[in-house]
C-alpha cells in the first residue's frame, strides 16, 4: 500500500530514518510551536507598587550606594536629569537642595541620577552645594529599569520617583516632567501638602 501523498513542502520537512531491519520509516514532521506570548509581568521598567531595584551604583566620589539599603530605613526620592551642570538640571537639583531640610525632616533621602560620570557629578555637586549624593549610571542600568531612558538610548527623560520607607515600593513615578514641577510635586507627596 502506498503512503499517503504529502505536499512537497511538508515532504521536505520530514526526514527518513531506518528501523532495526533497515526499512525506511518516515520520521514525524516536526511540531511547530507558537511563540509564547510575552509575559507582561516581566516588564523591564518599574511601575508604581513595584519594589525598588536591587542595584548598587557609584556616587560622585565613586562610593558604592545600594538603593535597598537606603529604603530599608528611609523613604527615597530619586530625580533624574539629562546632563549635569546644564540650566534645567541645575534648576531641578537646586530645588531639591533648597527643600532638602524639610525632605529629611519627613524621613526621606534624595539622590540625583544621570548618565554622567562620577567626575562630572562631583563637579556639579560641588558647584551647586548639593547636600545629597548624585549617582553615576553611564551604562543606564538604573535609568533603564526606572523607565527614564529615551528611545535610541544614551539620553533620559527628566523624571522623579518616590519609594516608601521600609518596603522600598514605588509610590510615585513621574517621567518627562519640567524641573520645577518635578520638585514641587515630589515635595508635595513627601510632606502631604498641595503642590
Curated annotation (Swiss-Prot):
It comes from the Eukaryota. GO terms for biological process: cell redox homeostasis; cellular detoxification of hydrogen peroxide; cellular response to oxidative stress; hydrogen peroxide catabolic process. Signal peptide: none annotated. PROSITE patterns: THIOREDOXIN_2. It catalyses: a hydroperoxide + [thioredoxin]-dithiol = an alcohol + [thioredoxin]-disulfide + H2O. Keywords: Antioxidant, Cytoplasm, Disulfide bond, Nucleus, Oxidoreductase, Peroxidase, Redox-active center. Disulfide bonds join 89-94. The active site is a conserved redox-active cysteine residue, the peroxidatic cysteine (C(P)), which makes the nucleophilic attack on the peroxide substrate. The peroxide oxidizes the C(P)-SH to cysteine sulfenic acid (C(P)-SOH), which then reacts with another cysteine residue, the resolving cysteine (C(R)), to form a disulfide bridge. The disulfide is subsequently reduced by an appropriate electron donor to complete the catalytic cycle. In this atypical 2-Cys peroxiredoxin, C(R) is present in the same subunit to form an intramolecular disulfide. It is found in: Cytoplasm; Nucleus. Its EC number is 1.11.1.24. Monomer. Thiol-specific peroxidase that catalyzes the reduction of hydrogen peroxide and organic hydroperoxides to water and alcohols, respectively. Plays a role in cell protection against oxidative stress by detoxifying peroxides and as sensor of hydrogen peroxide-mediated signaling events. Acts as a scavenger of H(2)O(2). PANTHER family: PEROXIREDOXIN DOT5, THIOREDOXIN-DEPENDENT PEROXIDE REDUCTASE. This is Peroxiredoxin bcp1. It comes from Schizosaccharomyces pombe (strain 972 / ATCC 24843).
Amino acid at each position: 500500500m502506498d503512503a499517503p501523498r504529502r505536499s512537497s513542502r511538508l515532504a521536505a520537512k520530514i526526514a527518513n530514518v531506518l528501523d532495526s531491519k533497515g526499512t525506511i520509516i518516515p520520521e514525524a514532521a516536526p511540531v511547530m510551536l507558537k511563540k509564547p506570548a510575552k509575559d507582561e509581568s516581566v516588564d523591564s521598567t518599574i511601575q508604581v507598587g513595584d519594589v525598588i531595584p536591587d542595584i548598587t551604583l557609584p556616587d560622585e566620589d565613586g562610593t558604592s550606594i545600594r538603593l535597598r539599603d537606603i529604603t530599608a530605613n528611609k523613604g527615597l526620592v530619586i530625580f533624574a536629569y539629562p546632563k549635569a551642570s546644564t540650566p534645567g538640571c541645575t534648576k531641578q537639583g537646586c530645588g531639591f537642595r533648597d527643600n532638602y531640610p524639610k525632605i529629611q525632616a519627613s524621613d526621606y533621602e534624595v539622590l540625583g541620577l544621570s548618565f554622567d560620570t562620577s567626575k562630572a557629578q562631583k563637579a556639579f555637586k560641588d558647584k551647586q552645594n548639593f547636600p545629597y549624593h548624585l549617582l553615576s549610571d553611564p551604562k543606564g542600568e538604573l535609568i533603564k529599569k526606572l523607565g527614564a531612558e529615551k528611545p535610541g538610548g544614551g539620553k533620559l527623560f527628566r523624571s522623579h520617583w518616590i519609594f516608601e520607607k521600609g518596603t522600598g515600593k514605588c509610590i510615585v513615578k513621574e517621567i518627562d516632567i519640567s524641573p520645577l514641577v518635578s520638585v514641587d510635586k515630589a515635595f508635595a507627596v513627601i510632606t502631604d501638602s498641595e503642590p
